[in-house]
Amino acid sequence: RCKKNTDSFYERACLEMIDVYDDVLEEHNAILVDDAIKQLSWKYDYSSQPKAPNKHWHILCGHNEEECTEAGYDWAHSIFQTAMYKYKFTEKYDVDTYLRIYMNAHTHGIEPHLHTDDGDFTMIYYPRLDWMLEYGGGTYIDGELIEYKGNRLVVFDAPLLHSAMPVSRECYQLRTCVVFKCTKVNNNV
C-alpha cells in the first residue's frame, strides 16, 4: 500500500499498516480501566498539531513503567504489556517498549486536527465500554474510519495522517483513549 511521497519521515515507514484488535483485555480488567479513566481529572489546552487552534483534554501517563506507576497509571502500562504479549508485537512490529503513554479526551465540538505522529507506530486503546456506535468519535486514519469500540486497540504507522472524529451532539459522554507512541527495537538504541 505504499504511496509515493517526498516526505522522508513518511517514507521510512512506507507500510501504511492499520491493524485493529478487539477484546484486548479480559473483561474484568477492561472494566477496571474504564472505571479508572472515568474518575480522572483532565487538563484542557492540548493541541494535536503545534500552533493549531483546536484543543482537547490530555493527560501524560509516563515515558516508562516507573513513571506510569509513580503517576498512578500503572494500568496504562499493563494495557501495553498485555497487548504486546497477547498479539506478539515484538515479532509482528519489532516493538518492545514505548516512547510515552498519554490519554486524550473529546466531547461534542472538540475536534483535533489531522496530524502525523513521531515514532514508528501509534497504538490507540478505546477504554469506554458504554460507548455507542451512534456517538461517533472513531479515528480517521489515512482515509479509513476505525469506529470507537470499548476494549479495542488500533495500531498504525505513525506517519499516517489521522485524527479523532467528531462526537455526536446527542452524546453526553467523554470520548477517551489511551495512546502509546512506539519505536521499533532497532530505533531504541
Can you annotate each of these PLM segments?
Residues 9-95:
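Non-heme Fe(II)/2-oxoglutarate
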Residues 1-3, 100:
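Short linear motifs centered on Gly/Pro in flexible linkers and helix caps
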Residues 67-189:
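Catalytic core of non-heme Fe(II) oxygenases with the double-stranded beta-helix
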Residues 5-7:
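Intrinsic-disorder-associated, low-complexity terminal segments enriched in Asp/Asn/His/Tyr and depleted
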Residues 2, 12-14, 188-189:
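Short intrinsically disordered terminal tails
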